[in-house]
């Protein structure tokens, strides 16, 4: 360790120092950077395989985000007591790093690259995912891996109308947006946001604001590499060899293939063929061309296939940019035909079927109790989540077969995006004390199933009677960029996503944006593109919202008869033990008697859930009886339970579920306004009488008075009045 060179440099980000260090840790990796941001510490390594992975036609990049519970001083729960599969947060953070760097590698690269971000220490004010993103960029930049440009990334919040870079926890809780911006020094590469109905122009300003800090981070990383090179801590970039295709073959294929494919593509446009019809037609013509060219070039199958795909891509892009023609015949800003249905399933609490072109989503809502909230056991602040959205993408949605496995990164990412889009309109617990779970099933997929899930989920929520503050819709925007010219497409389908340069998903209400996610395949986009895309997305979103509201203009006024009815009451926290009882005996009796489900919070909030509302009311009455406070000075109607020589015991709050109620003693002197010799002369066991609470004795027992609860007879009152009048004899004696 002593003879190792170590490079440590610091940059101020969001008013706090971010420190990068290399040379001390993980020196066998291609590049390794230790990032310290406050008390958050992340080790990011980048490693490349020395040889090309054979038999693939894509870039094999993997980004792993590894959480360690020791980072927050915790031991993992469960029997095994060690970290296992990555959490949802870890998967989303890995995707957050992957998306801005992937377009910056040479498109010909086939060497495996693995980036691993290991979270070593976490405070709650400095986001580890941002430290990991900056660390990944720096580790790649000092390595031999040929990343074209380094990137930077920040979170932009808005507190009291002012933008904040990388807000701390207290600021984040007040912010109306959580926007992640990543990019190079020249352009934005990735945007992801959750927001509370923020207008488009504010989002644009936030992106520009964040990009200014991103530029500073990129310049810092570039200087860091220069210093690392001087110290022998950085490596010269590897060269990716690109085999030039045989020009004779290219010429032989290009002319005939262009003519044939152009004719087929124009037929697709003119006849507005479906996805299956178009794919079949294109595959047949490609197979025909392939057989023709293979006869002359039998060893060039892979190259011929690449040439045909390239020609197809160029033709489609040219038709869009030069002629304004889309493959399905739509206008550039036209949304596919929309079909909307609600209440399609009889037993679930709410359901919506949203179809847009050949993309179809079935969203289903389930309402549960507070105890069914999801407990988030991760590296952040311990909390629970009462609103969840899950997304499923079965193989039949694209007419394919494949093994069914647990949700992958794509499913988790799509589910989280739709969840962010809807979170801003979900009612608070005080207004709607339910746990809400939505599952969106992608029944058909031809582009933007995540935005279809937003629309389907909104319909399902309204069908379930959830009082959302506003309906939400989403649309995916595309981009075709040729030189300085660009064309923005509304509601892209799968074919356009595959051949285009951008997938920009925008969700929101009529008032503003609730979620954004942008992925691109080119080295960044400009503010002009953002402005055009957001303006066009607003038009598309409003069109979709209007179609949805034609079917169901507002949330249903009543819940489904199959949904639990939840009653919310608040009791004195000191009375919780009375409801629970020794060993849970009392609350178990209440549940057995009523069939209701009862959740009690430490602050005294009680949630009573029952499908039968009468059973819920019965449980409420029992709990209110158990926790009812006896007020001194108040008059109660009670039943005489026992008689003794010195008085009688009166139950003023009846017992429930066979348990004793609240009773007190009426002393013999407090039974009547006249002298009482025998208690039985005034009351008998079982009598119902009025009593007044006069206080508590030294042992905390209730003291009651029948005398003070009833007016005295007139004759007694007169006697008592004379008895209290001072005598003349005493007066004269004074």
Swiss-Prot record:
EC assignment: 2.7.7.8
Keyword Cell cycle: no
CDD domains: KH-I_PNPase, RNase_PH_PNPase_1, RNase_PH_PNPase_2, S1_PNPase
Residues involved in Mg(2+) binding: 497, 503
Record has Magnesium as a keyword: yes
Domain S1 motif: 633-707
Name this protein carries in UniProt: Polyribonucleotide nucleotidyltransferase
Organism ancestry: Bacteria, Bacillati, Bacillota, Clostridia, Eubacteriales
């Amino acid at each position: 360790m002593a003879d190792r060179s170590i490079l440590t440099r610091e940059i101020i980000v969001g008013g706090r120092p971010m420190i990068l260090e290399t040379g001390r840790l993980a020196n066998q990796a291609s590049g390794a950077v230790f990032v310290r941001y406050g008390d958050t510490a992340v080790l990011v390594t980048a490693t490349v395989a020395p040889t090309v992975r054979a038999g693939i036609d894509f870039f094999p990049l993997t980004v792993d985000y590894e959480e360690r519970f020791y980072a927050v001083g915790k031991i993992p729960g469960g029997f095994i007591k060690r970290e296992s599969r990555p959490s949802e947060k870890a998967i989303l953070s890995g995707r957050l790093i992957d998306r801005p760097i992937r377009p910056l590698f040479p498109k010909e690269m086939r060497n495996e690259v693995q980036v691993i971000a290991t979270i070593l220490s976490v405070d709650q004010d400095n986001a580890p995912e941002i430290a990991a993103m900056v660390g990944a960029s720096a580790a790649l930049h000092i390595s031999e891996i040929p990343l074209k440009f380094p990137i930077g990334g920040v979170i932009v919040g808005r507190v009291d109308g002012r933008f904040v870079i990388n807000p701390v926890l207290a600021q984040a809780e007040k912010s109306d947006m959580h926007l992640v911006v990543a990019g190079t020094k020249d352009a934005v590469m990735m945007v992801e946001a959750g927001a509370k109905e923020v207008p488009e122009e504010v989002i644009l300003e936030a992106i520009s604001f964040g990009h200014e800090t991103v530029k500073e981070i990129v310049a810092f990383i570039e200087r860091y590499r220069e210093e690392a090179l001087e110290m022998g801590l950085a490596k010269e970039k590897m060269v990716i060899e690109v085999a030039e295709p045989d020009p004779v073959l290219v010429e032989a294929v290009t002319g005939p293939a262009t003519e044939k494919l152009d004719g087929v593509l124009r037929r697709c446009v003119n006849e507005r063929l479906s996805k299956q019809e178009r794919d079949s037609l294109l595959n047949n013509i490609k197979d025909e061309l392939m057989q023709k060219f293979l006869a002359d070039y039998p060893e060039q199958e892979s190259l011929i296939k690449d040439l045909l795909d390239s020609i197809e891509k160029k033709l489609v892009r040219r038709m869009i940019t030069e002629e304004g023609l889309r493959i399905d015949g739509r206008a550039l800003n036209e949304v596919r035909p929309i079909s909307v249905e609600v209440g399609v399933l009889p037993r679930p609490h709410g359901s919506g079927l949203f179809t847009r072109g050949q993309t179809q989503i079935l969203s289903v809502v389930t309402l549960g109790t507070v105890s069914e909230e999801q407990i988030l056991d991760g590296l952040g602040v311990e909390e629970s989540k009462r609103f969840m959205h899950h997304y499923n993408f079965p193989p039949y949605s694209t007419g394919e077969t494949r093994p069914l496995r647990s949700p992958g990164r794509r499913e988790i990412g799509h589910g989280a995006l739709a969840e962010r889009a809807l979170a801003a309109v979900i009612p608070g617990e005080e207004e709607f004390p339910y746990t809400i779970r939505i599952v969106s099933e992608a029944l058909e997929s031809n582009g933007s199933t995540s935005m279809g899930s937003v629309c389907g989920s909104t319909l399902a929520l309204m069908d379930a009677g959830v009082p959302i503050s506003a309906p939400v819709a989403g649309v995916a925007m595309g981009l075709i960029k040729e030189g300085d010219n660009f064309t923005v497409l509304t509601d892209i389908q799968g074919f356009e996503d595959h051949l285009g340069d951008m997938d920009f998903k925008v969700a929101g209400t009529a008032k503003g944006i609730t979620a954004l996610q942008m992925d691109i395949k080119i080295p960044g986009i400009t503010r002009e593109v953002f402005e055009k895309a957001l303006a066009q997305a607003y038009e598309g979103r409003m069109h979709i919202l209007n179609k949805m509201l034609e079917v169901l203009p507002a949330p249903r006024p009543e819940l489904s008869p199959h949904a639990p009815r939840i009653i919310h009451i608040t009791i004195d926290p000191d009375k919780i033990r009375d409801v629970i009882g020794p060993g849970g005996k009392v609350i178990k009796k209440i549940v057995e008697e009523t069939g209701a489900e009862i959740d009690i919070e430490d602050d005294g909030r009680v949630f009573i859930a029952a499908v039968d509302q009468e059973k819920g009311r019965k449980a409420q009455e029992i709990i209110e009886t158990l926790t009812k406070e006896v007020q001194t000075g108040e008059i109660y109607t009670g039943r005489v339970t026992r008689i003794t020589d010195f008085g009688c015991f009166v139950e003023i709050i009846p017992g429930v579920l066979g348990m004793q109620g609240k009773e007190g003693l009426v002393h013999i002197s407090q039974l009547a306004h006249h002298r009482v010799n025998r208690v039985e002369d005034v009351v008998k066991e079982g009598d119902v009488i009025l009593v007044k609470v006069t206080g508590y004795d030294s042992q905390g027992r209730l003291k009651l008075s029948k005398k003070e609860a009833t007016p005295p007879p007139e004759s007694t009152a007169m006697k008592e009045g004379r008895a209290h009048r001072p005598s003349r004899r005493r007066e004269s004696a004074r």
